[in-house]
C-alpha cells in the first residue's frame, strides 16, 4: 500500500437483517443461531477502493444504492459484515455528526458535544465557538434545543462544526442540498479551500456537483461499484445510463 493512501477499503460488504414482523424478531432472539427468522439484505457487496492524501473522491449513485451505508462504514458509524476498512487521520463527517446531535440540548451544547466526538478538547472547542456560530448563521437559535431546528439548520450547525475541526478528511453527503443557496455557496467555497491540503469524500446523485468538486469518482449501483476512475469518465457513464433508463421508462409508460 502506498504511503500516500489515507483510506483503503477491501471487499466491503454490509448486510442488514429484515424481519417481516416484530414477532419474528422476538423468535430470533430466542432461537439464536438454531433457526433464522429474517431475510438478509446486502446494502453493499464487494466494495474495494483506495483514496490517496489530497484526493477528492466523488461517490455517485441513485437513492438506495448504498452510498450512505458506505459513508457510515468509513465514518465508523457501523461495521462491515465482511471486508476491511482502514482510515488514517482525523475525519470530519457531516453526516455522522448530525446524527449524533442531542435533540434536547441547545445548539451551543451540541457544539461542545460534537467537538468532543470529533476529538477536540473542551478549551479548543470554546476557543472556536464564536467562529462556528458565525459560520452556521443560525442566530439566537444557537441557545435553543436542537429539536426546534429545521433539517437545514441542523445541517448548518453540523457543517460549521466540521469546518473548524482541522480534519485531514472531510466527508460530505447530500445533506448540503437542504440548505439555502447562500449557505450552499459558503460551504462550496470552504470545500474548495479545504481541497488544497485535505482529502474529500463527496456523495451525490448529481454528476454536475461531482465534476465541480472531485477529480476521481466511483459509481455505486445496487451495492456494487459499477465504474470507477476519472470523474469525467464516471459521470459520463452515469449520465448515459440514466438517460437510457429514463427513455426505457418513457417508452414503457407510453404503451
Annotate the PLM regions:
Residues 27-31, 92, 112, 124-141, ...:
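Conserved ABC ATPase "signature" region
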Residues 60-62:
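The feature captures the beta-strand-to-loop junction immediately N-terminal to the Walker
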Residues 206-212:
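Conserved H-loop
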Residues 212-219:
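Conserved catalytic segment of ABC-fold P-loop ATPases
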Residues 222-223, 238:
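Conserved ABC ATPase "signature" C-loop
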Amino acid at each position: 500500500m502506498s504511503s500516500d493512501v489515507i483510506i483503503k477499503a477491501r471487499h466491503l460488504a454490509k448486510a442488514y437483517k429484515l424481519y417481516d414482523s416484530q414477532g419474528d424478531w422476538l423468535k430470533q432472539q430466542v432461537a439464536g443461531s438454531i433457526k433464522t427468522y429474517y431475510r438478509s439484505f446486502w446494502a453493499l457487496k464487494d466494495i474495494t477502493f483506495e483514496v490517496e492524501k489530497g484526493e477528492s473522491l466523488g461517490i455517485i449513485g441513485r437513492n438506495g444504492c448504498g452510498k450512505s451505508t458506505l459513508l457510515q462504514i468509513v465514518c465508523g458509524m457501523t461495521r462491515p459484515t465482511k471486508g476491511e476498512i482502514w482510515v488514517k487521520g482525523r475525519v470530519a463527517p457531516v453526516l455522522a455528526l448530525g446524527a449524533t446531535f442531542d435533540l434536547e440540548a441547545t445548539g451551543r451544547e451540541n457544539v461542545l458535544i460534537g467537538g468532543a466526538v470529533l476529538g477536540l478538547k473542551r478549551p479548543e472547542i470554546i476557543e472556536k465557538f464564536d467562529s462556528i456560530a458565525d459560520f452556521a448563521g443560525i442566530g439566537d437559535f444557537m441557545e435553543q434545543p436542537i429539536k426546534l431546528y429545521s433539517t437545514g439548520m441542523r445541517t448548518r450547525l453540523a457543517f460549521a462544526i466540521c469546518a473548524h475541526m482541522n480534519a485531514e478528511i472531510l466527508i460530505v453527503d447530500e445533506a448540503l442540498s437542504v440548505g439555502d443557496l447562500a449557505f450552499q455557496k459558503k460551504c462550496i467555497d470552504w470545500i474548495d479551500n479545504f481541497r488544497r491540503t485535505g482529502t474529500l469524500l463527496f456523495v451525490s446523485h448529481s454528476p454536475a456537483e461531482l465534476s465541480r468538486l472531485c477529480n476521481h469518482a466511483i459509481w455505486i449501483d445496487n451495492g456494487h461499484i459499477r465504474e470507477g476512475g476519472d470523474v469525467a469518465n464516471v459521470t459520463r457513464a452515469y449520465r448515459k445510463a440514466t438517460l437510457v433508463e429514463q427513455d426505457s421508462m418513457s417508452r414503457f409508460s407510453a404503451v
